[in-house]
């Protein structure tokens, strides 16, 4: 991490089917060992599964899920006088989306089920309904920030 200049944000190309940058971000987080075509196949199958299950637009279900998972505040460690404090900070939009996608995929991978398609679609549906492991993760983060609100004046 250079102290001299801030790294520029690279533009994210939208995916070929939904023309959505959010989908591209999710697929790039989903892929393993550089196999993006397999990641796209898994994702599109999950979206098809969501459309059949909920009879709603799957992209809207995904957007709602990511919106529900996105944290508003998080805690970061900061050393103050020999003690390490958990300082609550507001989350910027880009970081919030990145955290939401990461938590969504972690929750989907840890879920019990037959394959990643069913696990991912179930987790997205749960997150859009404000339930599921990813939502619990967000609430846990918010609780930790609330508990350490007294250290908010130590912000960076």
UniProtKB/Swiss-Prot annotation:
Any single Pfam family the record assigns to this protein: Ribosomal_S7
A single Gene Ontology CC term: chloroplast
Localization, UniProt: Plastid, Chloroplast
Keyword RNA-binding belongs to the record: yes
Disulfide bonds: none
Function: One of the primary rRNA binding proteins, it binds directly to 16S rRNA where it nucleates assembly of the head domain of the 30S subunit.
Entries under HAMAP family matching the protein: Ribosomal_uS7_B (MF_00480_B)
Family affiliation: Belongs to the universal ribosomal protein uS7 family.
UniProt subunit comment: Part of the 30S ribosomal subunit.
Protein name: Small ribosomal subunit protein uS7c
Lineage: Eukaryota, Viridiplantae, Chlorophyta, Mamiellophyceae, Mamiellales
This protein's encoding gene: rps7
């Amino acid at each position: 991490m250079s102290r001299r200049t801030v790294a520029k944000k690279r533009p994210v190309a939208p995916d070929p089917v939904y023309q959505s940058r959010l989908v591209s971000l999710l697929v790039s987080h989903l892929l393993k060992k550089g196999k993006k075509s397999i990641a796209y196949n898994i994702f599109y199958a999950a979206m098809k599964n969501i459309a059949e299950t909920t009879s709603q637009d799957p992209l809207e279900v995904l957007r709602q899920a990511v919106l529900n998972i996105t944290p508003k505040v998080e805690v970061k460690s900061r050393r103050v006088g020999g003690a390490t404090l958990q300082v609550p900070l507001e989350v910027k939009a880009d970081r919030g989306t990145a955290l939401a996608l990461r938590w969504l995929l972690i929750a989907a991978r840890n879920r019990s089920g037959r394959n990643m398609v069913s696990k991912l679609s179930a987790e997205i549906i749960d997150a859009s309904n404000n339930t599921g492991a990813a939502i619990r993760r967000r609430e846990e983060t918010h609780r930790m920030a609330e508990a350490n609100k007294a250290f908010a004046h130590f912000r960076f």
